[in-house]
A protein has these predicted regions:
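Terminal low-complexity tails and localization/encapsulation signals of metabolic enzymes
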Residues: 1-53, 86, 90
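Glycine-rich loop-to-alpha-helix module at the N-terminal edge of alpha/beta enzyme cores
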Residues: 49-128
């Protein structure tokens, strides 16, 4: 008898804000797919159900991200402390406001308990 694998349905992560689960890579200020169209599946470790397909970027995309980050960092350094503080506070507020969804994504992707994932999200927000 030969075992046959059954196709696993794509897992739908029930987010309040589905726009938080982006199936692209953020490079140089924009969401992009791989230049060659390659991607790989992110799966739920519990049952292997696919959650998302994300770009499999190559060396050129990594170099571009590094080059742009180095340039943007110079702009960041020229901002006043007050400006940087305002931007970081806004980022912090967004993380806290979306902590439940971010924790659900983390739980689905890594298999950790939801309460632990939410604590991780909020703990990391505190670093900002």
């Amino acid at each position: 008898m030969t075992a046959q694998l059954q196709p696993v349905e794509r897992r739908v992560v029930d987010l309040r804000d589905p726009s938080l689960l982006v199936e692209k890579a953020y490079v140089a200020g924009e969401w992009v797919s791989a230049a060659d169209g390659r991607s790989f599946a992110v799966t739920d470790p519990y049952d292997g159900a696919p959650i998302a397909d994300v770009p499999s970027l190559g060396v050129e995309a990594a170099r571009r991200a590094i080059d742009v980050a180095a340039t943007v960092q110079k702009d960041w350094a020229r901002r006043t402390a007050k400006e940087r503080s305002r931007i970081l506070k806004a980022w912090y507020d967004l993380i806290v406001a979306n902590a439940d969804d971010l924790a659900l994504i983390l739980t689905t992707e890594q298999g950790k308990p939801l309460s632990e994932a939410k604590a991780e999200v909020l703990s990391n927000a505190a670093y900002i």
